[in-house]
Amino acid sequence: MDFDRELDEELEFTKSTKKVKIYPTFESMNLKPELLKGIYNYGFEAPSAIQSRAIMQIIRGRDTIAQAQSGTGKTATFSIGILSSIDTKSKDCQALVLSPTRELAQQIENVIEHLGDYMNVRSHACIGGTQVGEDVKKLQQGQHIISGTPGRVLDMIKRRNIMPRHVKMLVLDEADELLTKGFKEQIYEIYKTLPAGAQVVVVSATLTPEVLEMTNKFTSDPVKILVKRDDVTLKGIKQYYIQCEKEDWKFDTLCDLYDNLTITQAVIFCNTKAKVNWLAGQMRKSNFTVAAMHGDMKQEDRDSIMKEFRSGSTRVLISTDVWARGIDVQQVSLVINYDLPLDKENYVHRIGRSGRFGRKGTAINLLTSQDKDELKSLQHYYSTKIREVPADLSKIM
């Protein structure tokens, strides 16, 4: 992704953020040569807006609260910050990254592994749904960076398989989810085991005032890099709706879309596990090749589905919001909200899948007559315009 100065200046940051120095190239950050090589090898060419502002704040040891759009390189922002601070000569765990889902924790570990490819860095995804014995074995070998879910990481700390006394940095990714959905007590327990003065980095696509208030418990005089609310929705994503009137008419509408659009890969979001299973069954009956994923599935099944989807052997993934946060599949060009999300904050996480790293994407919302008010509410919440699908479907992709 090229650093687009003009596009970068279009992003509206809060007043306090405008005082933060911008580093327009990775070279200007004076990074380790091995890390710089890993960054370029991973495909980055220049920092995104959030990377150009936040990486150096993290490297300097400042507690940092960073908010940016999905797909703008938030994961790489803190990963580069972590890798800059790691002493690979030591076997100690020096950084913990906590995420709300297993898939996101694995994705982060994968990014860290690739960016640190030339650094001899050791990292491990410590997540629930896997054998405890596998974690113990890996942790005993010594891991510099651990990316995990709060429950499993806390369990490993209590078992003394993770020794947090040398941890320099704690990262809370998708902080709005972590701090509001039952993880708060686990995170605070983990935080209390860390050395005094450990750096805390808080990252999310959306940060409500309530979540920002909660971060006071974990941070000390943090630098805040926040975008204005009306810039949270991704630039470059075309947003449309189709008025289906009745729930029963949505499926036929979906089939019509697939008959008329050329789609690389797509994600279809439903609000319940039951509907995911039902819709997958209906599409298979209509000879569509689809995969389905939700939180009730075994971890190995979810891993297998994600592997197939990333490789491109499956072109359509039907999912609940378990997939909405942070899972990066570069080829996704279309997101369809079969149901509007129950939580407005999830809208940006869902549609962000279709425009990764500046590529153009399309989001289509299927509406019943009862969804009209919710659509207006979404548009007001994000200060965005969601247009009706034009008669000529070739114009929307």
Swiss-Prot record:
Pfam families: DEAD, Helicase_C
Compartments where found: Nucleus, Nucleolus
Superkingdom of origin: Eukaryota
GO CC terms, sorted: FAL1-SGD1 complex; nucleolus; preribosome, small subunit precursor; small-subunit processome
Keyword set, alphabetical order: ATP-binding, Helicase, Hydrolase, Nucleotide-binding, Nucleus, Ribosome biogenesis, RNA-binding, rRNA processing
Residue ranges annotated for the Helicase C-terminal domain, each copy included: 236-397
GO molecular function, a single term: ATP binding
EC id: 3.6.4.13
Reaction(s) the record says it catalyses: ATP + H2O = ADP + phosphate + H(+)
Location of the motif DEAD box: 173-176
Gene Ontology BP annotations: maturation of SSU-rRNA from tricistronic rRNA transcript (SSU-rRNA, 5.8S rRNA, LSU-rRNA)
Motif (Q motif): 24-52
CDD domains noted in UniProt: SF2_C_DEAD (cd18787)
Class of the enzyme per the UniProt entry, highest EC level: hydrolase
Domain Helicase ATP-binding: 55-225
InterPro entries: DEAD/DEAH_box_helicase_dom (IPR011545), Helicase_ATP-bd (IPR014001), Helicase_C-like (IPR001650), P-loop_NTPase (IPR027417), RNA-helicase_DEAD-box_CS (IPR000629), RNA_helicase_DEAD_Q_motif (IPR014014)
Written domain comment of the UniProt record: The Q motif is unique to and characteristic of the DEAD box family of RNA helicases and controls ATP binding and hydrolysis.
Function: ATP-dependent RNA helicase involved in 40S ribosomal subunit biogenesis. Required for the processing and cleavage of 35S pre-rRNA at sites A0, A1, and A2, leading to mature 18S rRNA.
Family: Belongs to the DEAD box helicase family. DDX48/FAL1 subfamily.
This protein's name: ATP-dependent RNA helicase FAL1
